[in-house]
Amino acid sequence: MSFIRSALAAAAFVALSIGAVQTASAADPENTVILKLKDGDVALEIRPDLAPKHVAQIKKLVREGAYNGVAFHRVIPGFMAQTGDVKFGNMDKGFDAARVGTGGSNYPDLPAEFSKEPFVRGTVGMARSQNPNSANSQFFIMFDDGPFLNGQYTVVGKVVSGMDAVDKIKKGSEAENGAVKNPDKIIKATIEADTK
C-alpha cells in the first residue's frame, strides 16, 4: 500500500512540476519573449511593472524581427551572456566584429529604470555604457548571482524556462572581456502571444 501511495505522490509531484513550468512560460503571453537558440528555446518573462519603457522597446524590436540573427557577442563564464546589438551584431547581415557591442537600435536611448529587483541567476538586465541613461537594445542574461549590479542596471525580467540552453551559449575569452569568436546567436525572437 505504501508503494502505491509513494507512486501516486511522485506522479502528482511530476504533474505539478510540469504544470508549473507551463504556467510560468504562459503566465502572460504578451510579456513572454521566446528566444530560439541552437540548444533550445528560452522563455523570458519581461516585467513592465519594473521597467515599462525598456519592456516596450524590447517588445517593439522583437515584433520588428530586429533580434533575429543577433549574436551573443560578450559571454563571460560564471557571469552573463550579452546580446541585442541590432546595429552591428546581426550574424545574418552586416555583422561587424570590430564594432559589435557598441550599437543599438534606431530608437532613442532609454532613461534608467532601476529597481530593487536583484540580479540573480536567470535575471535579464539591460546593457548600457557608463551613462546610466544609455540602454537601448542590448541585454544580458545572468549565469550566476551578481549583487554588485543591483540598483546599477535596469532589470527587465527573468528566464522562466530554458536556462539549460542559456548555459550552453558559447563562452568568450575572459582575457578579452568575454568577446566571442564565431558567437552563437538568437535564431529567432518572438512574443509568445503572437505565436498563438
UniProtKB/Swiss-Prot annotation:
<dbReference type="GO" id="GO:0006457">
    <property type="term" value="P:protein folding"/>
</dbReference>
<dbReference type="InterPro" id="IPR002130">
    <property type="entry name" value="Cyclophilin-type_PPIase_dom"/>
</dbReference>
<feature type="signal peptide">
    <location>
        <begin position="1"/>
        <end position="26"/>
    </location>
</feature>
<comment type="function">
    <text>PPIases accelerate the folding of proteins. It catalyzes the cis-trans isomerization of proline imidic peptide bonds in oligopeptides.</text>
</comment>
<dbReference type="InterPro" id="IPR029000">
    <property type="entry name" value="Cyclophilin-like_dom_sf"/>
</dbReference>
<keyword id="KW-0574">Periplasm</keyword>
<dbReference type="GO" id="GO:0003755">
    <property type="term" value="F:peptidyl-prolyl cis-trans isomerase activity"/>
</dbReference>
<dbReference type="Pfam" id="PF00160">
    <property type="entry name" value="Pro_isomerase"/>
</dbReference>
<dbReference type="InterPro" id="IPR044666">
    <property type="entry name" value="Cyclophilin_A-like"/>
</dbReference>
<dbReference type="InterPro" id="IPR020892">
    <property type="entry name" value="Cyclophilin-type_PPIase_CS"/>
</dbReference>
<dbReference type="GO" id="GO:0042597">
    <property type="term" value="C:periplasmic space"/>
</dbReference>
<protein>
    <recommendedName>
        <fullName>Probable peptidyl-prolyl cis-trans isomerase</fullName>
        <ecNumber>5.2.1.8</ecNumber>
    </recommendedName>
</protein>
<keyword id="KW-0697">Rotamase</keyword>
<keyword id="KW-0732">Signal</keyword>
<feature type="domain" description="PPIase cyclophilin-type">
    <location>
        <begin position="29"/>
        <end position="194"/>
    </location>
</feature>
<keyword id="KW-0413">Isomerase</keyword>
<dbReference type="InterPro" id="IPR024936">
    <property type="entry name" value="Cyclophilin-type_PPIase"/>
</dbReference>
<comment type="similarity">
    <text>Belongs to the cyclophilin-type PPIase family.</text>
</comment>
